[in-house]
Amino acid sequence: MQFSKDMVAAFARPAILCLLRQGESYGYEIIQKVKELSNGEIQWTDGMLYPILHRLEEEELIQSRWGESETGRKRKYYSLTKHSTPAIDQYRMQWTTLNEFLAPLWATQKP
């Protein structure tokens, strides 16, 4: 399924933060988790993900460190900061409100 840029921009930030709540991760792993959790319906690219990771890091919602993979390759690992919990809570409230607004509209929509 193709998502518009606006839709991706709206849900990518809270999705990344929620995924990082499960523990630190690197870019390719985040892309794979999104694909897996969406049963392949959502497929992010490096070009979409990394600018968002950089913005989240600039806003101090995430932090990064360089590490090595099991094969010795360098990877940049991302994790949450102390500032991320309030942001996640705010995103949750916003998405809940939007869902509560849209759910009855979807239900009453005529074909």
Report each predicted region and the residues it spans.
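Short beta-strand "wing" residues that participate in macromolecule-binding interfaces
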Residues: 64
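N-terminal helix-turn-helix DNA-binding core of bacterial DNA-binding proteins
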Residues: 3-48
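Short, hydrophobic-biased segments on the C-terminal half of alpha helices
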Residues: 50-55
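Amphipathic alpha-helical dimerization/coiled-coil segments
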Residues: 86-111
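Glycine-centered, phosphate/nucleic-acid-interacting loop/turn motifs that mediate DNA/RNA or nucleotide
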Residues: 60
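Basic, amphipathic "hinge/linker" alpha-helix immediately C-terminal to the N-terminal HTH DNA-binding motif
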Residues: 70-92
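Short, solvent-exposed loop/turn elements at beta->coil junctions and helix N-caps
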Residues: 4, 67-68
